[in-house]
Amino acid sequence: MMILGNLRVATLSDGYGLIPDAAILIEGGRIQWVGPEAHLPPSAAPRHDMGGRLCTPALIDCHTHAVFAGTRAAEFEMRLKGASYAEVAAAGGGIVSTVMATRAAGADELLAASLPRIDAMLAGGVGTVEIKSGYGLDIETELRMLRVARRIGELRKVRVRTSFLGAHAVPPDHRGRPDAYLAEVVLPALKVAQDEGLVDAVDGFCEGIAFSPAQIAHLFAQAHKLRLPVKLHAEQLSNLGGAALAARHDALSADHLEYLDAEGVAALAAAGTVAVLLPGAFYALRETQAPPVAALRAAGVPMAVATDLNPGTSPLGALGLAMNMACTLFRLTPEEALAGTTIHAARALGLSDTGRIAPGFRADLAIWEAEHPAELSWRIGPAPLHARLHEGEFV
């Protein structure tokens, strides 16, 4: 049991939910009480004076591909020189290069490559991170990626949620045969992953260069049979109706959404599906069509913000910078950006016990060298993190 006193607390219970001169009582890894310190109930718990600093929920990065091997720096140089996607792929670049590097990496090597990325996230105030598979595209490597993700959660003070993304791309050994790939690799791997307790949700990529709506619908039907929630990369490069498809399957989230239309917005709103915005990919790909944030806002669709950390299209490991990008590129408000990396990000992962500072919630907290929560989106550069708590313990 402990008391954190002399705080400015952004509870995220109603907008920022700011409480000046606040205190938080923590017991058993959970928040027992929060409010003005003058009203703190009598307690013998030790008190930590936080010097008037800002406290928010620990941030949640709800969309990452943080487990992979290799880099795509050479491809980055090629693109800057004008190479097309096809030219990059012909030279051995693109997702296939990451798949080959990840397949070649053993579990220990993959873990060693991934931990520094996670450590950088934690230094930015992240307390929960979602990690996808999807760079194996064979049964063995997809499972290895998920096992490494689970291992990260054991080695670091961070809550890890895993998403099975076998339907990320069609690998070279199944080129032109996406249905066979789903039947021979994706669905068998998903069943093993579920049996081993390796997967928290099932994801897919619905796009002309990946999988069709019908193929994703088949995948989601199988996920539901396994009692697993679903989420979807949708409307990133074109509109195939992926967001509406996700909504019909009660998806936790639909992610990217640059080409989302009015029908898709309405479907997300009706289903309560979270729209996950990924400004890092928008920036890195130099896209020009932004997600319809004003329409999402007007429809009451909850909007989350994430890094989409991956080696090809968003080598971004700083959630604070993603918040700034969401504001400057997509015109979110700083309040929306913070909600998008706390309470709405939690919802995108199916979590109901984190993302706010309220009694009964996990005491996953971030203490910042800041006076107002808008500073977290305003800053560009190192995160002003003073301390982080994981389940009520300083880390």
From Swiss-Prot:
SUPFAM superfamilies: Composite domain of metallo-dependent hydrolases, Metallo-dependent hydrolases
GO CC annotations on file: cytoplasm
Sequence positions that bind Zn(2+): 63, 65, 233, 308
Location in the cell: Cytoplasm
GO BP, one annotated term: L-histidine catabolic process to glutamate and formate
Main location: cytoplasm
GO-annotated molecular function: imidazolonepropionase activity; iron ion binding; zinc ion binding
Cysteine-cysteine disulfides: none
Cofactor(s) needed: Zn(2+); Fe(3+)
Function: Catalyzes the hydrolytic cleavage of the carbon-nitrogen bond in imidazolone-5-propanoate to yield N-formimidoyl-L-glutamate. It is the third step in the universal histidine degradation pathway.
Official protein name in the record: Imidazolonepropionase
Species annotation: Cereibacter sphaeroides (strain ATCC 17023 / DSM 158 / JCM 6121 / CCUG 31486 / LMG 2827 / NBRC 12203 / NCIMB 8253 / ATH 2.4.1.) (Rhodobacter sphaeroides)
Underlying gene: hutI
